[in-house]
Amino acid sequence: MQQLTEIVEQALEVIEKASDLKTLDDIRVDYLGKKGKITDMMKMMGSLSAEEKPAFGAAVNQAKQAVQQQLTERIDGLKASELEAKLIAENIDVTLPGRTLDIGGLHPVTRTIERIETFFGELGFVVKQGPEIEDDFHNFDALNISEHHPARADHDTFYFNPKVMLRTQTSGVQIRTMEHEKPPLRIISPGRVYRNDYDQTHTPMFHQVEGLMVAENVNFAELKGILHDFLRNFFEEDLEVRFRPSYFPFTEPSAEVDVMGKNGKWLEVLGCGMVHPNVLRSVGIDPEKYSGFAFGMGVERLTMLRYGVNDLRAFFENDLRFLKQFK
């Protein structure tokens, strides 16, 4: 037992003096390995009596635990010292913020579409999509647009052939929805549309959001209330809003909606009206039982008014100096 005590004291002494992890590992092998000094003490068990063996075995195990615990503590201490020395050498200020990436922002047109979708989504309107290459039935005929209407002219519409064209409005999505779903319906249809026009306030491709509600006893007062609330929500102002009588082939009665600008002038922002009975009949909905309202707005137009942009073409020129303003 005296010999075991001396071995443990010797081990603890060399562990305390060790200055690196490799030396500590060598000490572990020297004392606790298969041929280590403490392990060899177990060979003495054979020369002991039955009464002495339990006490001796317990002493050897305690010796192993004492040496192992000291090794573990010394290893942890050396690792902590190495880390501290490394941090000092590299002179890291951990309080400094990390490097950040130059993150882009949403395009202003995308921001506007999301804002519109959020407002109408809270009122139960579902977003619907449709093809951008459209046939004349869904783009014109079903919308009560006569064969000789100016909107069908080549100078307004991009035709692939007399029956197929790039859609001039997203109203075709409303027709397709009414063909496959029965009232009550509440939908909005955002998307790209195409018209043969290009100047400071028009581009050949632009974005529209059209809305449709069809159910029993839908009336114009509901339409006015929803659009009035939308415009005040969108512009975040208690705007003065007016509805002017107008004409659209697919609605009757029809109106254009204006808001009072900061310059004291009325600004047109969207069109609307009660769905024409002929439109409902074209998709198999009984206009005697159901009524509905529809509205449409140009996304770029609303975006220009909200952010004070004067030239529509700025949205499509990808000038980072312009786009970074909307982060």
UniProtKB/Swiss-Prot annotation:
Localization (cell): Cytoplasm
Annotated residues that bind Mg(2+) are located at 252
Query: What is a GO molecular function of this protein?
Result: ATP binding
**EC annotation from Swiss-Prot or TrEMBL:** 6.1.1.20
Judged by the first EC level, this protein's enzyme class is: ligase
Q: Name one GO biological process term.
A: phenylalanyl-tRNA aminoacylation
Cofactor(s) of this protein: Mg(2+)
Keyword annotations of the record: Aminoacyl-tRNA synthetase, ATP-binding, Cytoplasm, Ligase, Magnesium, Metal-binding, Nucleotide-binding, Protein biosynthesis
Question: Where is it predominantly found?
Answer: cytoplasm
Q: Share what the entry says about its subunit structure, partners included.
A: Tetramer of two alpha and two beta subunits.
Q: Which family does it belong to?
A: Belongs to the class-II aminoacyl-tRNA synthetase family. Phe-tRNA synthetase alpha subunit type 1 subfamily.
Protein name in UniProt? Phenylalanine--tRNA ligase alpha subunit
Q: Look up and give the organism this protein is from.
A: Shewanella frigidimarina (strain NCIMB 400)
